[in-house]
Amino acid sequence: MGKLELTFIADIHSNLEALEVVLEKVKGGPIYCLGDLVGYGANPNEVIDIVRSKGIKCILGNHDYAVCTGDTSYFNPRAVNAILWTRRVVTKENSEFLLSLPRILRLKKENRKILLAHATPENPIFGDYIHPETDPFKFLSYATEYEEDIMGLGHLHVPYAYHKLDKVIFNPGSVGQPRDGNPLARYCTINLESLKVKFFELDYDRELSARKIVQAGLPTIFATRLFKGI
């Protein structure tokens, strides 16, 4: 990968098998994670350990925030179940790592200004689930009101790329729990010169990931949805 390309991942959600497959495919170059390392899945410590060991730059997601603070007020009961389980098993060191993550990350690469946030730039932790097709005016406002050339968002678990005014707003999709009807692990790259976004999808051992979720006593839906991409 050349210096003009950056790799983005998001919403790993403690899915070790999906993360390992993605990182095996991505060779070289900086990797950025748009939040939610944990939640739903059965390997929070292993995921955090890998992210830390590889120096992947991350921002804080809403599940990360809930795990390290205990604030579950914005979650449904099944998600709360997974958050409380994760709080019990995550190491103190890894919890402190999550708490240290920035809510927004601003970068400059090859004369391109970049803004990374989990949900939305104005409300990175508790913002809405947004998509260019359902929220066109919001995306137009981001393109006109923010100075950044590139804006990366997570949270939705659905990949997209919105191009406007020589800018791009994108979501790489979810590594560990896609929700667009396709269960494959997702990530994307961006060419800093052309702003072209390339999306990638990879299969992984979903049987193993699902079995771990069930064996951990987590809600079964978090296992079954891995096969449906919902």
Predicted segment positions?
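Acidic, His/Gly-rich catalytic cores of divalent-metal-dependent hydrolytic chemistry
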Residues: Y162-I230
